[in-house]
Amino acid sequence: GNPNLPGHVLLTGRVTGDKWAVSDGEVHGGARSIGAGGLPPALQAQVVNDLSRPVANLDSPLAGNQPRWLEELAAYNRGFASRHRQVAELEARSRTFDTAYRMQTAAPEAFDLTREVADPATRSLYGLDPQETRSTGTKLLLARRLVERGVRFILVPSVSVPGGRGDWDTHTPAQVREALPKLALACDQPLAGLLTDLKRRGLLDQTLVVWGGEMGRGGPGHMNHNGNAFCWWLAGGGVKPGFAYGATDEQGFAAVKDPVHVRDLHATILWLCGLDHRQLEHNGVGFDSTCRVAHGMIA
């Protein structure tokens, strides 16, 4: 990874016109969606909801005195740590300060899309001109820049699209008819552009792209939450292209052929990232959440 940039970035907000509209700061799922889970707190997500200010307070008011102030703070923290046990959160906060200092020079360049969006070919590839694809395309273009610069994990939520109801939380036929075509349009070209761009830059083989949601639809009219049948797609990162695994019944209510448990999916993603799920264990609140496999690897 790049020590001058965060290892985990969440790109939220929406692009309207030529500006990155600031979201309200809320992330679906709350802190669990951006936290580090069982990993050190320093690995939680850096939330970017305003491209003009990707990192809050990035400009230092201390100017030339900043290195001295940071060293004094580090010395104080080391002294505190030497007198107290179990100071993982303090260590994580200290590393966060160090990263923030280094980001003052690296982040402005990484998040600057000026030259990218001036290229007509890039604008066409990511769909930056049509209103329907501009928001997703801009964030995926930024995600590609972060991949190039060594950011290890980037999350791009599929947010609502302009014009009426436009999110994935559809529970009536009317909502599906209104939202689904817009959402598909917003995602299709930008995602294809991202994969094309990563491949031609030689980055796709070492970058795993995952697209999916948290559930399918079932019940009367296919309008209810359904955790028994839904699909994800993976590309790059060693995934075999053109490979499909599993199938649902004719109604899409249940997986009936080669069903994949979510733990299988997690294990597969970890394996593609070079991690052995059997070596990972997190003792959470009264339970052992080791990533176990029910049916083995799927890719």
Q: How does the language model describe each region?
A:
Residues 1-299:
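Ligand-binding pockets and gating/stacking loops
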